[in-house]
């Protein structure tokens, strides 16, 4: 198992290029199960979750060829298998995304209940209810979801009691081959969903309301789609994380290949804290702040402040003057990084879903342990400003969502080594 050894308080400067969005690539890879023709997907990030999804598709019978490290050509026209097994699905929760497309195209499938980050309840009930609304029969048998729709899926209204990104994506993919019109009410509005809509539209699916909380889908009257090649949008969470690298070290950094509109909640908060930003069409440059002020954040669904940036801003709060407050409204048990930041010297108190951080605090290098994907990046951020050497363990969490993180940070001047545990 690998860990990162990080020398703190090293000056940083330069630019970093953002990879393709993992959270856009995963549903788009799953959506290829709806296609009968070869599809090329560009700008895929080389991260563990993408490799796991590619392996799952291959296991289902997809033909895959990596044309370069970030471009995958795949064909699902000769799928021979509609069972997503536990040994593959357990590696990440996003595997549930194959449920909708497999059911829509083949009228029956077996999908293992998923794994992934341990950050509270992420019930699959919303997915199952959506499939049932489209006419599927669902049974849970020995840890597997057994879904059947012998006569095919039929368009219907799907009302999500709670906004769900992957739930919306699964419903979209299933509805694309359902007979008639489906309305998804209380849909998630993330940019990754907008890109999935564009991908499905390239295959002939009519979708209205893209970017809003109500989507109207007219299914294609066919047993498969003819999807076109696509390039994955830049990863807004990776972009936000590298802006936080600049912010926590108070460095001048340029973040390239991004869509600034996708991270406005993040940039607005950085400006409020005291940073100057030069926002261009596809880049943002952050400049050192004279004084970093404490702040308040409440995580919300897009376009609100993203829960996936909460941990990074908690690390940043340790270097801001005053008392910062972070309220997590989307997931329970998502403050596991707080105790690890405390090991570095952070002054954090927790009360249910609210964290109070007192700053500015001098952090000191220590051994810390990553507990989930975004928590791991927060520990790296804190280690960059801690006095002395820190070691971040269990970085397999980090590898799930960040491409070559140590290489990108080292290119800015940092001293980060990837080493093997003894």
Swiss-Prot record:
Catalytic residues (positions): 117
Record's catalysed reaction(s): phosphoenolpyruvate + UDP-N-acetyl-alpha-D-glucosamine = UDP-N-acetyl-3-O-(1-carboxyvinyl)-alpha-D-glucosamine + phosphate
Pathway per the UniProt entry: Cell wall biogenesis; peptidoglycan biosynthesis
Pfam families recorded: EPSP_synthase
Entry binding sites for UDP-N-acetyl-alpha-D-glucosamine: 93, 122-126, 308, 330
Binding site for phosphoenolpyruvate: 22-23
GO CC annotations on file: cytoplasm
MF (Gene Ontology): UDP-N-acetylglucosamine 1-carboxyvinyltransferase activity
GO BP annotations, alphabetical order: cell division; cell wall organization; peptidoglycan biosynthetic process; regulation of cell shape; UDP-N-acetylgalactosamine biosynthetic process
Compartmental location: Cytoplasm
Enzyme class, first EC level, given as a word: transferase
InterPro entries tied to this protein: Enolpyruvate_Tfrase_dom (IPR001986), Enolpyruvate_Tfrase_sf (IPR036968), MurA_subfamily (IPR050068), RNA3'P_cycl/enolpyr_Trfase_a/b (IPR013792), UDP_GlcNAc_COvinyl_MurA (IPR005750)
SUPFAM superfamilies: EPT/RTPC-like
The enzyme's E.C. designation: 2.5.1.7
Record PTM 2-(S-cysteinyl)pyruvic acid O-phosphothioketal, positions in chain: 117
Family: Belongs to the EPSP synthase family. MurA subfamily.
General function of this protein: Cell wall formation. Adds enolpyruvyl to UDP-N-acetylglucosamine.
Protein name, as recorded: UDP-N-acetylglucosamine 1-carboxyvinyltransferase
Biological source species: Helicobacter pylori (strain HPAG1)
